[in-house]
Amino acid sequence: MAAAVRFQVVRALPMSRPAISAAATSVFCSSSHRQLHHAVIPHGKGGRSSVSGVVATVFGATGFLGRYVVNHLGRMGSQVIIPYRCDIYDTMHLRLMGDLGQLIFLEWDARDKDSIRKAVQHSNVVINLIGREWETRNFDFEDVFVNIPRAIAQASKEAGVERFIHVSHLNASMKSSAKSLRSKAVGEKEVRTVFPDAIIIRPSDMFGREDRFLNHFANYRWFLAVPLVSLGFKTVKQPVYVADVSKGIANATKNPDAIGKTFAFTGPNRYLLFHLVKYIFGMTHRTFIPYPLPRFVYSWIGRLFGLSPFEPWTTKDKVERIHISDVMATDLPGLEDLGVQPTPLELKSIEVLRRHRTYRWLSSEIEETKPAKTVNY
């Protein structure tokens, strides 16, 4: 009876939190300590919650390539400063790409040098992805590809930025028939002059879910036929997957051998434009009806479309760019030198082109489409 009374008294006494912890510890410590082999414990990168040591300012992050670059930087645990000129709601899709507090959004003015300095002052990596498909009354190609990159490179140099990465184009040349490619060539020269150790990336035409390459040709279905200069038999293209480009840029931020080099990012295969467009229409299960159109007529049509106050369907400059063959930059390092294996077009094109199919063919297998013929020149 006494024991029972004592038991009731003990239960009635309130136990503090330290007493509970001590009691629990005494129970678990009495058992033998369990040894775990190190192979059982998970290892690897910490992902978005890790700290990569990279503090990167990404200009042009709201564009096609920018969202992939921000995602790869966030995945490796980098802090990313995102200058933006658009409405704040147009940046919402980027907010999920980094851990809490790792993405910093900063409104900036491309013609205000103080806002550029503010965007790069705390970064050790600056990436310029700014680009434009057509000219506007506010920004022409010289502003977009020459003046703004030069101002960003100058501000980065003054701020002591360790790495400056500038994205150009594979076909950038002073002798190009396309004004945008001539401007990009001048921009490369200006960036290299201001920031000699800059890393210059020259990707070919990029394809991906939101691209203006595969989607552009697929949208020709609305015109019932596809106009091509010389039917596309004189143009060779080597498109590259956008995720490969962004992964290469992310790897360049950490690769010590990349400083001061120019890289050419291309896909693994080269295609005649005719066979490439034929493959696009085959993937969408649409009838491919090509017809030859003289270059000067096509350029004149592009000039008319370029007069639109809205986003133009095509422009004179785009007509020129489409029909310029991709150079074979065998003398420049590529994606493989940054640890990236280029992805074939045939593996990822369905992600872009499925939405152009009718309901009847929406779920058909990609194996039903014959791959595009490749060339070696």
Swiss-Prot record:
GO terms for molecular function: NADH dehydrogenase activity; protein-containing complex binding. GO terms for biological process: circadian rhythm; response to glucose; ubiquinone biosynthetic process. The modification N6-succinyllysine is found at residue 175. Keywords: Acetylation, Electron transport, FAD, Flavoprotein, Mitochondrion, Respiratory chain, Transit peptide, Transport. Acetylated on lysine residues. BLOC1S1 is required for acetylation. Acetylated by CLOCK in a circadian manner. It is found in: Mitochondrion matrix. Expressed by the principal cells of the epididymis. Detected in flagella of epididymal sperm (at protein level). Its main location: mitochondrion. Accessory subunit of the mitochondrial membrane respiratory chain NADH dehydrogenase (Complex I), that is believed not to be involved in catalysis. Complex I functions in the transfer of electrons from NADH to the respiratory chain. The immediate electron acceptor for the enzyme is believed to be ubiquinone. Complex I is composed of 45 different subunits. This a component of the hydrophobic protein fraction. Interacts with BLOC1S1. Interacts with SLC2A4. Interacts with CLOCK. Interacts with RAB5IF. Belongs to the complex I NDUFA9 subunit family. This is NADH dehydrogenase [ubiquinone] 1 alpha subcomplex subunit 9, mitochondrial. The gene is Ndufa9.
